[in-house]
Each structure stands twice: as structure tokens, then as C-alpha cells.
């Protein structure tokens, strides 16, 4: 049941990302994703869970890969699946990313 709820929340998050007012926040989340991966790789932030790192890596790979569920060349529709994946990943790891952001501010 938790997975189904997470998928539904991810899809809702994906729709929210597509709204113009939420794009800035989405870009901030993506930036945080990359910063967390970089800090973990450099050994600066060793508290990351392996699950979180794998999910972040999978999300980034999915977004940059040319093969998608909905191809990116279809204007207007091509980024819906990318947004849904970002929304799903964010739903699954937002607690740890919040902890990471607090750690960065220290």
C-alpha cells in the first residue's frame, strides 16, 4: 500500500512540477540532488543512505537518457514522465534531503 501511495504522490508531484510557479522549486530540488551526490562522493556527507543515492542516480539517469516512457521530442508531453519521476523520487527521499539541507547550513 505504501508503494501505491508513493506512486500516486509522485504523479501528483510531477503534475505540480509542470506548473510554471513550481519550476523554480523543482530546479532547487535538482540542484540539491546533485550537491548531495557530490558531497557524498567527496566524503563530506557520509550519512547518506545507499537507497537514497541509488534513487537519486536513477532519477538523474532517467532524465538525461534519450529513451523515456514518453519521448522528450513530443513537445508539451515529453517532460511529463520526467516530472513524474522527479516527483516520485522527491516523495520517497524528501526527509533525507531535508536533513542534508540542514547539515549544509551548519
Curated annotation (Swiss-Prot):
Q: How does it sit in the membrane?
A: Multi-pass membrane protein
* Signal sequence annotation: none
Enumerate the Pfam families for this protein: DUF1232
Give Gene Ontology CC terms.
Answer: plasma membrane
- Report what the protein is called: Uncharacterized membrane protein YkvA
Q: Localized where?
A: Cell membrane
InterPro entries linked to this entry: DUF1232
Transmembrane stretches in the record are 53-70, 74-93
Q: Which UniProt keywords apply?
A: Cell membrane, Membrane, Transmembrane, Transmembrane helix
Amino acid at each position: 500500500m505504501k508503494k501505491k501511495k508513493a506512486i500516486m504522490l509522485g504523479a501528483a508531484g510531477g503534475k505540480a512540477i509542470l506548473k510554471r510557479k513550481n519550476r523554480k522549486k523543482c530546479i532547487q530540488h535538482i540542484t540539491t540532488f546533485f550537491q548531495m551526490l557530490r558531497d557524498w562522493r567527496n566524503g563530506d556527507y557520509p550519512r547518506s543512505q545507499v537507497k537514497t543515492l541509488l534513487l537519486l542516480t536513477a532519477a538523474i539517469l532517467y532524465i538525461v537518457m534519450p529513451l523515456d516512457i514518453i519521448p522528450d521530442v513530443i513537445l508539451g508531453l515529453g517532460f511529463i514522465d520526467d516530472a513524474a519521476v522527479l516527483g516520485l523520487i522527491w516523495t520517497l527521499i524528501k526527509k533525507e534531503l531535508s536533513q542534508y539541507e540542514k547539515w549544509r547550513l551548519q
